[in-house]
Amino acid sequence: MSSHEEKRVLPFSASEMFAVVADIEKYPEFVPGCAGLRILDRKSAGNVETIIAEMMVSFGALRETYTSKVTLDRNKNIVDAHHIDGPFDHLDTRWCFVPRDSGSEVHFAIDFAFRNRLLAAASNLVFDRMVRKTTGAFIARAAQRHNASHHAQQ
């Protein structure tokens, strides 16, 4: 089992960060290892959207597909994802964005375990690096979107 939690203050608003993480259809464009993503179902109830998504991940010769239930809560600025089917015993992630005067405080947590011991051992070797690369990719995507929108306003 592997888990990680981190908290960062970023110069982007909570709604800007939420928009980047909630835009799961774009993950193949910028999330390391995301080789494809397909929306299987989408439902909305007020400001809460629930998406069932199938993601293909690729790391070297390893390719796996898994299905998750993703909950987007716009009122609370929270994105939760829970594993439904695939190679994991469990996989849970949570992004929470708290407004701050000069941006937002971003809380990220991931907890997972593979069913297969070989996959578990391999993931343990690269887990910290992959988490850093993934969170860095979301921050870079926010910077890209924020800078583009800032220049368009000038």
Walk through the language-model features, giving the residues of each.
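Hydrophobic-ligand binding "helix-grip"
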Residues: 28-29, 36-43, 56-107, 111-113, ...
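A short glycine-/small-residue-rich loop at the edge of a beta-strand within enzyme catalytic domains
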Residues: 8, 57, 129
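Amphipathic alpha-helical protein-protein interaction surfaces
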Residues: 23-26, 62, 102, 123, ...
